[in-house]
């Protein structure tokens, strides 16, 4: 797995790192799994958290160790985190852009539950495989890996909303917060030849559920920690439905506004073309030759009125 590093605005409402920081909360004992150079943990420390980390890359781990209480250099495939850190050692375990790199994310997620103190939570971020850019690219027969992003070449698992929630539930957890980051299907790193797409397809994709969701950021707790699982699941589905409806309405309004803007621009272009053609005709010798008799006729007609 490559080493990732990032600067981010902790106040942003549309950034997975800032959303994770908010879902973790202040003054927590945190394990940052796949901590890289410690950029996320640094923001958590600034909020009063005590942070430990796990990282496979020794150089990145060395940088994080200058900030964290402890950094374990290990491969998540075979490390026993509970044996190393102790059961119930953390208020929050963070899995930021980790699960998609794991051949068996189910096993990892079930394992980290043992690290949670009573009332603890797991905070997860992962890309959305149903983002509109990927839908459009697949319509054109494209699935091209990149160094970063939705099709990071090191991703081995892919999640939509239902798949991610099923993974969480399978680990004995229930999602209490699901927050999307959003990006327009034509505004990300995925290669889409949009002029070649049929009319209306892009707007249709924009309006689909999660068509503009770039990443999911989730907070999950033990299923028995905050009451009945079914009640929480039902309420979560209701909230998700309300959110999707609001986002769909917003996307439809945006699409209508964009279509109106395009129609206006096209009309302005047509008017400009017509004006240029008119000037071109008026500048020809034939037009000037015909214009002189018309002016004389106009003068004569005006004289007769007098």
Identify the role of each PLM range.
Residues 6, 14-15, 39, 59, ...:
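S-adenosyl-L-methionine-dependent methyltransferase catalytic module, highlighting the catalytic core
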Residues 11-28:
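Conserved alpha-helix/loop element of class I SAM-dependent methyltransferases that forms part
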Residues 28, 69, 91:
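Conserved acidic residues
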Residues 28-34:
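Conserved class I S-adenosyl-L-methionine
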Residues 82-92:
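A short acidic, Gly/Pro-enriched loop at the edge of an enzyme's catalytic core
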Residues 96-101:
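Short catalytic micro-motifs in class I SAM-dependent methyltransferases
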């Amino acid at each position: 797995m490559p080493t990732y590093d990032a600067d981010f605005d902790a106040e942003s409402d549309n950034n997975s790192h800032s959303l994770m920081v908010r879902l973790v909360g202040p003054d927590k004992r945190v394990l940052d799994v796949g901590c890289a150079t410690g950029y996320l943990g640094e923001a958590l420390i600034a909020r009063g958290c005590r942070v430990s980390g796990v990282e496979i890359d020794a150089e990145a781990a060395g940088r994080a160790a200058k900030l964290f209480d402890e950094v374990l250099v290990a491969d998540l495939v075979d490390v026993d985190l509970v044996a190393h850190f102790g059961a119930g050692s953390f208020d929050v375990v963070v899995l930021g852009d980790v699960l998609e790199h794991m051949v068996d994310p189910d096993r990892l997620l079930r394992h980290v539950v043992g690290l949670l103190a009573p009332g603890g939570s797991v905070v997860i971020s992962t890309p959305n495989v149903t983002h509109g850019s990927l839908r459009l690219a697949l319509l054109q027969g494209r699935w091209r890996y990149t160094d970063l992003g939705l099709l990071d070449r090191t991703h081995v698992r892919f999640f939509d909303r239902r798949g991610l929630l099923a993974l969480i539930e399978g680990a004995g957890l229930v999602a209490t917060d699901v927050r999307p980051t959003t990006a327009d299907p034509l505004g990300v790193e995925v290669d889409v030849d949009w002029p070649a797409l049929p009319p209306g397809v892009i707007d249709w994709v924009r309006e689909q559920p999660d068509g503009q969701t770039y990443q999911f950021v989730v907070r999950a707790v033990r299923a028995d920690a905050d009451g009945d699982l079914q009640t929480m699941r039902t309420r979560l589905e209701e909230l998700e439905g309300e959110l999707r409806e609001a986002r769909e309405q917003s996307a439809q309004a945006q699409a209508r506004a964009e279509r109106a803007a395009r129609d206006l621009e096209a009309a302005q272009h047509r008017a400009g073309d017509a004006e240029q053609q008119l000037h071109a005709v008026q500048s020809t010798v034939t037009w000037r030759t015909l214009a002189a008799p018309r002016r004389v006729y106009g003068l004569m007609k005006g004289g007769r009125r007098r």
